[in-house]
């Protein structure tokens, strides 16, 4: 495993384990699978694990795994808490206490303000005494380092970076988002200030790997160097010295093994100009077929009308990339236990939680127009009858 330094000289594995996407059964994390994958990663040098207060069951799962295997003091835990919940420092203390209890630890290595969307959020936190709170937690050793996660444009990101002496930050960044979100501009700005940058969504929620349009597959196949789409995405990130840790939401043994291999092999500055040009072409091919830039994080769920929002958008993108029949099949599958997109009542609850700022109501309406054909409606009607029995 390769390592890069944080602000204080600690060695962090370039591959971090994102703990949001553990496999679940009936809404509960499959703990045996999660433990096997976490320990495989740990035994191969991964020492950075990312979770959050709002990831159902995640903090408790890794807390149990680390305690059972006696590795808490050999890893770094990064967890997050939404600023919306931070009304007073007393409430914040209570929530932090719950996180420590779940994680079965007396300290958190990296504490992030989750989805800090605007400088106004930080200004509000200052009015409740957040800077003094940070100083107190740092002095007591309860929290070692502070940062924030961000989804949004680069200009606002730079304002937040400049507003405080942060220890680190977490941004969405990949070869499709090089000039969107915080982007390369934000990455470079943080790096110039000596602030380590952790990366989320390296595969854009799987969009850089799964159901690629044929044009993108052909570009990869014709390139002089052969790697899988996932390996190319990680190599593009590891190639950049400004990147400290790349998170991957791993939930299969194969994914863990492949990501470890790539993290061990890739060197800074390894990609050639031809490699970079090839990935730009791939990004263009994917973008030309993508109807909705959903990463499948499911922060928008649950929907009051039981619509599978991310599943609908995946089917909509599949329709655009691979044709109506492929989109139809995926849509039938994703609405098996859910209501169709046309059931949307336009409440807008989902849009307040979407980190990608997607106009979900508008896109659901557009998806319904092309996916809910007479054939689909007939199939859904039959399935609904059987569901009632």
Task: Go through each PLM region and give its residues.
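N-terminal binding-site loop/beta-alpha segment at the start of enzyme catalytic domains
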Residues: 1-75
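Structured C-terminal cap/extension of enzyme domains
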Residues: 5, 40, 46-47, 66, ...
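Hydrophobic faces of well-ordered beta-strands that scaffold small-molecule active sites
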Residues: 13-17, 49-51, 75-79, 108-113, ...
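Glycine/proline-rich, positively charged
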Residues: 25-26, 39, 86-203, 211-217, ...
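Short beta->alpha linker loops
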Residues: 53, 57, 117, 151-152, ...
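Short, well-ordered alpha-helical microsegments
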Residues: 58-62, 153-158, 256
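Alpha-helix-loop-beta-strand connector modules within alpha/beta enzyme cores
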Residues: 60-79, 131-140, 192
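Acidic, glycine-rich active-site loops and adjacent beta-strand->loop/helix elements
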Residues: 81-83, 371
């Amino acid at each position: 495993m390769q390592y890069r330094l944080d602000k204080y000289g600690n060695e962090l594995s370039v591959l971090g384990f994102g703990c949001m996407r553990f496999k679940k059964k009936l809404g509960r994390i499959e703990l045996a699978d999660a433990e096997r994958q976490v320990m495989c990663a740990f035994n191969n040098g991964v020492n950075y694990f990312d979770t959050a207060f709002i990831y159902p069951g995640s903090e408790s799962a890794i807390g149990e795994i680390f305690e059972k295997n006696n590795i808490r003091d050999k890893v770094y835990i990064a967890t997050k808490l939404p600023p919306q919940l931070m009304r007073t420092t007393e409430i914040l203390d209570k929530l932090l206490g719950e996180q420590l209890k779940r994680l079965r630890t007396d300290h958190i290595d990296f504490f992030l303000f989750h989805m800090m969307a605007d400088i106004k959020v930080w200004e509000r936190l200052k009015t409740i005494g957040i800077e003094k709170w940070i100083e107190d937690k740092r002095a007591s050793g309860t929290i070692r380092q502070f940062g924030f996660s961000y989804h949004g444009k680069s200009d606002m990101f730079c304002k937040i970076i400049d507003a405080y002496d942060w220890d680190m930050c977490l941004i969405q960044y990949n070869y499709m988002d090089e000039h969107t979100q915080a982007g390369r501009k934000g990455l470079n700005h943080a790096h110039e200030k000596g602030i380590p940058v952790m990366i989320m969504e390296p595969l854009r929620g799987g969009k850089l790997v799964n159901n690629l349009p044929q044009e993108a597959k052909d570009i990869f196949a014709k390139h002089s160097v052969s790697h899988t789409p996932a390996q190319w995405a990680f190599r593009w990130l590891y190639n950049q010295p400004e990147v400290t840790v790349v998170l991957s939401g791993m939930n299969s043994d194969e994914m863990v093994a492949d990501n470890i291999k790539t993290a061990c092999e890739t060197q800074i500055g390894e990609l050639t100009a031809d490699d970079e040009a090839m990935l730009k072409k791939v990004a263009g091919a994917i973008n030309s077929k993508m109807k909705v830039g959903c990463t499948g994080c499911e922060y928008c769920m649950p929907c009051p009308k039981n619509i599978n929002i991310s599943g609908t958008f995946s089917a909509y993108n599949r329709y655009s990339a691979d044709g109506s029949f492929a989109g139809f099949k995926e849509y039938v599958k994703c609405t098996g236990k859910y209501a169709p997109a046309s059931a949307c009542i336009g409440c807008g609850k989902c849009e307040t939680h979407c980190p990608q700022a997607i106009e979900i109501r508008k896109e659901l309406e557009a998806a319904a127009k092309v996916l809910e054909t007479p054939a689909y409606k007939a199939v859904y009607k039959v399935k609904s009858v059987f569901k009632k029995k």
